[in-house]
UniProtKB/Swiss-Prot annotation:
Organism: Hyphantria cunea
Keyword Signal among record annotations: yes
Protein name: Beta-1,3-glucan-binding protein
A Gene Ontology BP annotation from the UniProt entry: defense response to bacterium
GO molecular function, one term: hydrolase activity, hydrolyzing O-glycosyl compounds
Compartment(s) of residence: Secreted
Residues making up the signal peptide according to the UniProt record: 1-18
Lineage of producing organism: Eukaryota, Metazoa, Ecdysozoa, Arthropoda, Hexapoda
Keywords on record: Glycoprotein, Immunity, Innate immunity, Secreted, Signal
CDD domains named among the record's database cross-references: GH16_beta_GRP
Length: 481
């Protein structure tokens, strides 16, 4: 049964027994609406997860209709709050909780709470000071990891006047576990950085690994890459030895994430100038915080807010894949990668990377829409059976059982965080059979075991086109629905 919980909730946690006792859970039903569940703080605790159903049984493998995770204690307690839950006297909340203590996960299940009265929101039930609730706060479908969002409220805003390390994490790792498998390593460089703020813009710039200090051309196929110090991923993604066709990632790039800020549902505004250059592409994404539907094959989903391949010319027959084509939308299956993706051609003949544009994602409980410069260009809605109903049965490894336990928008019904970056190559972003300028074919195949090697061997051709490889971001803003 433990394996089922790990698969649904967090594949990276090993459930443990006998070392930590989950304390009593304090549960409150609030008026006119709202729900709270909390446990007292302990120095060893690093995560509190709540899963519950109203008037319906729940097992350890279920994702509840009341669901959330808390990463930080406040006022001596780990408190999960959902201001949109409506309960009445006599309702029964069946639930379980998971607590991570000293890197071990501990489950307390078969719990229930019967609503005997609705409490005032200012009452904490724990003796701590009341938490003020704005009197003008209108309800919203938007949920935060902690705290309450109000309709129309700006819940995140970044203008990149400086780089704020308390808001953004600069990633450093080799994406060995990435489903896209880009041909890069993400590095936090102190000299000639890949991530910088200049002139009021975030600037993320890809570079060649062989031109980094201590590296040469031969390093790519016979050297070692050790970025363990400062690495933001497990150890296997922090070091690599080149061996045969398994070369070092030939491109060094930058990636930042807002892991301190994650949310469910809202409108995201990004004003950006996309990178240009053969075989590079931007990463302007929402990525799943907990990966509760699975961690492989996009099982927990990714939303591409905006992307355009960097090639100024890129075609396959009569189909244009160049920088003139904007694409984006949700991804939730590797085999059927582009099922929900949409595309839009530039209307004035210019490339998307020639100018700044405002890209907008509206993520709601009923649909996902994309806009650019105030014009909606994509809309993705679930079927009666959910978003998974948009996929034929031939799309294997879609976690249909888990998705059916969520809402119709599953897996896009949980907390996601912001990601900004630049990548190159990959096995998903450039279809096989395309040709770039001068009818030059794509140098690798997506299923080939030597894909990265063949990409690097064609470096003289593609690197000459990297005249504007930077992703420039003017601002990012998230507004509650």
């Amino acid at each position: 049964r433990c394996a089922r919980v790990c698969a649904v909730l967090f594949l990276f946690i090993q459930i443990s027994y006998g070392q930590y006792q989950v304390p009593q859970v304090t549960v409150q039903a609030l008026k006119p609406r709202g729900f709270k569940a909390s446990i007292p703080d302990s120095p060893s605790v690093s995560l509190f997860v709540f899963q519950g159903n109203i008037n319906r049984a729940i097992s350890k493998s279920d994702i509840g209709t009341i669901s959330g995770e808390i990463l930080k204690a406040k006022d001596g307690r780990w408190t999960f709050e959902d201001p949109n839950v409506e309960l009445k006297v006599g309702d029964v909340v069946n639930y379980y909780v998971v607590v991570v203590s000293n890197r071990g996960g501990y489950i307390k299940d078969n719990l229930s709470f019967t609503v005997s009265a609705l409490e005032d929101p200012s009452s904490t039930g724990t003796g701590t000071d009341p938490v003020p609730t704005p009197t003008t706060c209108r309800p919203t479908a938007t949920k935060l990891r902690s705290g309450v969002a109000c309709a129309g409220q700006t819940i995140f805003e970044e203008n990149f006047n400086t780089f704020r390390e308390d808001v953004w994490q600069i990633e450093q790792y080799i994406p060995v576990y990435s489903t896209e498998f880009p041909f890069v390593s993400y590095q936090h460089l102190s000299q000639d950085p890949t991530v910088a703020v200049t002139g009021g813009n975030l600037r993320i710039t890809p570079k060649l690994q062989q031109r980094m200090p201590g590296f040469t051309d031969s390093s790519i196929y016979s050297g070692s890459l050790n970025i363990f110090s400062g690495c933001t991923a497990p150890a296997e993604a922090c070091m690599k030895d080149a061996w045969g066709a398994s070369i070092l990632p030939p491109v060094v790039s930058g990636r930042i994430t807002s892991k301190a800020f994650a949310f469910t549902y809202g409108t995201v505004f990004v004003k950006a100038k996309l990178p240009q250059g053969d075989w590079i592409y931007p990463e302007i994404l929402l990525e799943p915080f907990l990966k509760k539907y699975g961690s492989t094959h996009y099982s927990s989903g990714v939303i591409k807010i905006a992307s355009a391949r960097g090639n100024r010319e890129l075609t396959s027959g009569y189909t244009d894949y160049s920088n003139k084509m904007l694409f984006g939308g949700p991804v939730m299956n590797l085999q059927c990668y582009d099922t929900l993706l949409e595309s839009k051609a530039s209307s004035n003949g210019r490339q998307w990377g020639d100018d700044f544009h405002e890209y907008v994602l509206r993520w709601a409980p009923e649909r996902i829409t994309l806009s650019v410069d105030g014009v909606e260009w994509a809309r993705v809605e679930p079927t009666a059976s959910g978003l998974s109903g948009r996929f034929p049965q031939t799309c294997s490894k879609l976690p249909r059982t888990f998705l059916a336990a969520g809402t119709k928008m599953a897996p896009f019904d949980d907390h996601f965080y912001l990601t900004l970056g630049v990548a190159a190559g990959s096995i998903t972003e450039f279809p096989d059979g395309v040709q770039t300028s001068g009818s030059r074919p794509k140098p690798w195949t997506n299923t080939g075991s030597k894909a990265m090697l063949h990409f690097w061997e064609d470096m003289d051709s593609w690197f000459a086109t990297w005249n504007q490889p930077q992703l420039l971001v003017d601002y990012v803003k998230v507004v509650a629905l």
